[in-house]
Amino acid sequence: MLRDKTQTFLLTHGIDLDPSLDEQQLIDEEVIAKLVEFSGTGDEDTVLEIGPGVGNITEGLLRRAKTVICIEKNPKYIPVLKERLKHFPNLDIVLGDALHEKLPRSDRLVSNLPYMICEAFLQRMLRMDVKSVTFIVPSGFAKILEARAGEQEYSKLSLQAQLFYTSEIHMEVPSSAYLPTPRTETCIISLVPRMSSSVADEALKQLFRQGDKHAKNALREALIRAGICSTKRQAVSFIAESDVPVETLDRRVTRLSLNEIESLGNWLRTLVD
């Protein structure tokens, strides 16, 4: 059984799992097979896996993908991965932090994503070009991503996720599928990039892709990239003549509130209607 195999790897390499650091290992072969299946991974795909741990998901991906790139923050797992998966020539192991490391180009993202980085990593994903994202995440987080305007869970994160992706929650993952058992309910969710339904939506996407710039500068670039303005001078003029509050323009994009983002979206729509 995969549980026994995992425990052997941990014991052999002297690894203690720390639940406070989201170090739960997926040990249910059926759930792993479903995760790989839902990801749509094929033999032409390069897959990026975040936080492989002892490599239980990694092994399943390696049997289907052209290449699997693993980014693991904790060095204690690297010897396990190298020993266990040494017979797979299509594996590339990277020691680094997925929130700060320059991420390699990939076709798909697959991960039992560490719970504490879910929101922060989603912000990184907004600037990535991939076919699909298939993650195991807390069920509460998945509900936020799918929440509609007016619902209690709806937030800035909901707006961003739905602007960039279509989502599907495939299945709940039983707590028995992990070692050790988590206190959080989890599920498998897939996100597929969404084509912009309007020029205004594309401009809003481009705004979010500006990272931590001040909104005024990010908005200027977004207007140009979305094709609303052809020059910086024109974009600056549009912003200067707008009714967007100075406080909003001076705020960094990552600090904008849901209300501010919705107001910016409404203003962008007036430019193209």
Which residues does each PLM region occupy?
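Catalytic cores of RNA-modifying enzymes
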Residues: M1-Q206, E260-D273
